């Protein structure tokens, strides 16, 4: 469990769709940002190629980009997680898979895998947390969105920082990473309330100084 908690400290999530605000190729921009983030010290990367203007409709390009991101993560010994796409994750033997409440069932992932991937589950209500706190196969919770966010078009309602404290008051000790509207200025309070880490998209993809941003996200861990 301690290994999972450490992994969650500075958890970067991105796909090429998150890099279209920059000039040039979104794919090359993602790889460049990921390289800088890895050099700066992120502890986990989730490949989330999903939504409008992503490569979701082009499986070959998505597969190629996933392999490139995985290769970078391996160079830095950082876990490489894939969002929801179980076929891709198992085909390239990703370190882990992250799923939402409406995505692929955890039991299906475990039955199909010939190795034990790390599995994360998104949580947005206390009822979901209670129902899954002792469920076999789930290694950590992604809780949120803590604040409203524009990085995900289909996000659930924001739950607020107190949600983190409420989870711990219920005696739920599953490792958890907070996501949604998180930036350098609110990281300390989120960790103080009990989150093992912070997950960010735009805080890094839109940063003017990725090294400084990652350092600030990690400084209270």
Swiss-Prot record:
Keywords attached to this entry: Magnesium, Metal-binding, Thiamine biosynthesis, Transferase
Binding-site positions, Mg(2+): 84, 103
E.C. number: 2.5.1.3
Reactions the enzyme catalyzes: 2-[(2R,5Z)-2-carboxy-4-methylthiazol-5(2H)-ylidene]ethyl phosphate + 4-amino-2-methyl-5-(diphosphooxymethyl)pyrimidine + 2 H(+) = thiamine phosphate + CO2 + diphosphate; 2-(2-carboxy-4-methylthiazol-5-yl)ethyl phosphate + 4-amino-2-methyl-5-(diphosphooxymethyl)pyrimidine + 2 H(+) = thiamine phosphate + CO2 + diphosphate; 4-methyl-5-(2-phosphooxyethyl)-thiazole + 4-amino-2-methyl-5-(diphosphooxymethyl)pyrimidine + H(+) = thiamine phosphate + diphosphate
Pathway given in the UniProt record: Cofactor biosynthesis; thiamine diphosphate biosynthesis; thiamine phosphate from 4-amino-2-methyl-5-diphosphomethylpyrimidine and 4-methyl-5-(2-phosphoethyl)-thiazole: step 1/1
Cofactor(s) it depends on: Mg(2+)
UniProt binding sites for 2-[(2R,5Z)-2-carboxy-4-methylthiazol-5(2H)-ylidene]ethyl phosphate: 149-151, 181, 201-202
Biological process, per Gene Ontology: thiamine biosynthetic process; thiamine diphosphate biosynthetic process
Gene3D superfamilies in alphabetical order: Aldolase class I
GO molecular function list: magnesium ion binding; thiamine-phosphate diphosphorylase activity
Disulfide bridge partners, by residue number: none
Family: Belongs to the thiamine-phosphate synthase family.
Function: Condenses 4-methyl-5-(beta-hydroxyethyl)thiazole monophosphate (THZ-P) and 2-methyl-4-amino-5-hydroxymethyl pyrimidine pyrophosphate (HMP-PP) to form thiamine monophosphate (TMP).
The protein, known as: Thiamine-phosphate synthase
Lineage: Bacteria, Pseudomonadati, Pseudomonadota, Gammaproteobacteria, Pasteurellales
Protein's gene: thiE
